[in-house]
Amino acid sequence: MSLITFKAGKLRRVPGTKLLRADPEKGYIVMNRDAYGLIHFQWAKRNDLENPEDDIIVFSSECTFEKVTECTTGRAYMLKYPSSAHSLFYWMQEASDDNDTSYAERINSYIKDQDLLDPARSDVATVSDMMEVDTVEQSEPIAQPTESSKESSEIGAPNSDEINSSEAVRNLLATISAQAGFGGSTVDLCEILKPSNLTDLLCQEGVIDRLMPYMPPDTPNNLEGVLAIVSSPQYAQALRSFSQALNSPGGVNIISALGLSLDESANPNEGGALQFLKAIARFVSRNNGSE
C-alpha cells in the first residue's frame, strides 16, 4: 500500500570531505507498507522505480525525517537515526516548497504510529498520480537533466492472501522493536524467538511443512511437534550461542555469510542479533511471492 510519494533527489557526500552535493538525477521518495505490514522508506530514480537505490525498513520511532537547518541555499532533508551518526540526505524536487513541511510531518507520523495506519485508507497520491511534466524550479545551482520518457509504474497494494498471512510476521517484528528499543542495544534471540512469540507464525498454512526438513527426524509433522522442539532446552541453548556469536565483535560477518544483506543505515553500535533479525525481515519482504 502506497502511503506517500513525492519528488526528491539524493544528496551525496563529496569523497574525502564532509560536504554534500546535490545529485541532479530526478527521483522519488516513496513510503509504502508491504504485504507483511512492514513500512519501507525508499528512494528510486524516476525511470527505475522497480529498483530503488534506498529501500529501508523503518520500525516505530527509530528514525525521523528532518529539514537540514544548516543548509541555507536549498531544500535539504535527512533521514536521521538519533542513536547513530549515520543519516541519509535528500533534496526536494517539487516545483514549490509549499508541501515540504507537510511531507516531512506525514513521513514522521507513519514512522511513529505504524500500528494506527488503516490499510483501507489511502488519501495519498501514488506514483502514477504524479506523472505530469516536470518543471522543477530550484534556487540551488543544480543542472537539470532532460526527462527522456514518461514513467508509468505503480506501486501495488498486497492481495488478500498476503494480508491474511502478514499479521503474525508483523507481531513478531513488533516484539523485536519493543525488546530492543532500537537505541543501539543488543537483543537476545531466546527472548525474541520464544514459543509464545512464534505460535501465531507457526499456525500459518504451510509453515510447519517448510520447517520439517530442519527438524530432528522423529519430530511429528504438526504444530505440537514443532512447539516441543522450540520449547526444549537444546533449542534455547542453540539460540543463546548463536545470539552471542552475532553480538560479538565481527558478528555481522555471519549475516553476510548466510547470504543476507546488511543495512548500511544501521546504527554502528547496533548488535548483530538485531541486525540479523532485520536482515531476515528485509529478505522475506523482498522475496514475498517469488516462490
Curated annotation (Swiss-Prot):
Domain Pru: 1-114
Keywords for the protein's UniProt record, in alphabetical order: Cytoplasm, Nucleus, Proteasome
Region (Disordered): 135-162
Membrane-traversing stretches: none
GO BP annotations listed: proteasome-mediated ubiquitin-dependent protein catabolic process
Localisation: Cytoplasm; Nucleus
UniProt superkingdom: Eukaryota
Claim: Ion transport is one of the keywords in the record: no
CDD domains found in the cross-reference section: PH_Rpn13
Domain DEUBAD: 178-290
GO molecular function: endopeptidase activator activity; proteasome binding
PROSITE patterns: DEUBAD (PS51916), PRU (PS51917)
Endoplasmic reticulum listed as a keyword: no
Gene Ontology terms: cellular component: cytosol; nucleus; proteasome regulatory particle, lid subcomplex
Comment text on domains: The Pru (pleckstrin-like receptor for ubiquitin) domain mediates interactions with rpn2 and ubiquitin.
Subunit structure: Component of the 19S proteasome regulatory particle complex. The 2 S.pombe rpn13 homologs, rpn1301 and rpn1302 are present at a 0.2-1 ratio.
UniProt function note: Component of the 26S proteasome, a multiprotein complex involved in the ATP-dependent degradation of ubiquitinated proteins. This complex plays a key role in the maintenance of protein homeostasis by removing misfolded or damaged proteins, which could impair cellular functions, and by removing proteins whose functions are no longer required. Therefore, the proteasome participates in numerous cellular processes, including cell cycle progression, apoptosis, or DNA damage repair. Within the complex, functions as a proteasomal ubiquitin receptor.
Family in the record: Belongs to the ADRM1 family.
Identification of the protein by name: Proteasomal ubiquitin receptor ADRM1 homolog rpn1301
Species name: Schizosaccharomyces pombe (strain 972 / ATCC 24843)
Lineage: Eukaryota, Fungi, Dikarya, Ascomycota, Taphrinomycotina
